[in-house]
């Protein structure tokens, strides 16, 4: 029985990169493998997978290398390294690696597993200089909304979260848009493609185009990228008669951001961050003109949620001036305020007194900055 190193690990070795995941495949049945390796443990529920010395192993798809290669997602992942170091591959794999081309491994690659649509988009975000083969878009456009809708939310979310941390996160959504696959998981952003972000003197792009631009500016901070994706989501609910203005889009965006996070079954912090970005980004952009009480409440809320860094990064990217240069000194001032001992343990009175003192401190800071 031959055991092969397969998939992304082989690809990364050929690209001169250190593999982060190691998957193995063997050319026999599960029964044969377990007989040869009794210490292995079966762990797969829907597929035949077992753990052997901490490594995932499974039978070759279709029983042969050739059938395994065409059953994979992309040609660049359709490779295997045997126990003596011989390389086996999809006929187009090496050339596609050389050409930096993302190509489906077969004409049915995406219909065989529709999650591969999102995997392709994630690779595109990870490698912004790689091209996408025309066949990939042909297969994407042939997908139906129902084929994508039945996917487990966790699998879609996993690919998106990896893309948010990639060098060009917006490309994940651009590829999905180009292939007609934003719906149903990113329904709001499909609609955002056709809505102006605002008056021409401020925004030349659509709502989606504006959000994607900010996402790439914020690359390197995955939470800030997520918040950029959500911040203008409320604009899709603007009355067409009011366009290109979007009065009140902040409040409209909160339930939409929460619904998106729920649909993808994301951790609660993403729901809170998306809602915060939608509701408060306009205030953040006007931070220097806000009254002391409004500034205090905004700073306090963002800080209490543990989202100061990504939120103020978003505010800087979305504003014509670096508002964080005002926000962080203000945050230092209010967090340094200490409630006098006689005001301790008085419930709401204590909270009101602390807020009052923080507002006074912010007003004093503004006078000092203006002097």
Regions found by a protein language model. Give the residues of each.
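Catalytic cores of the polymerase beta-like nucleotidyltransferase superfamily
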Residues: 1-371
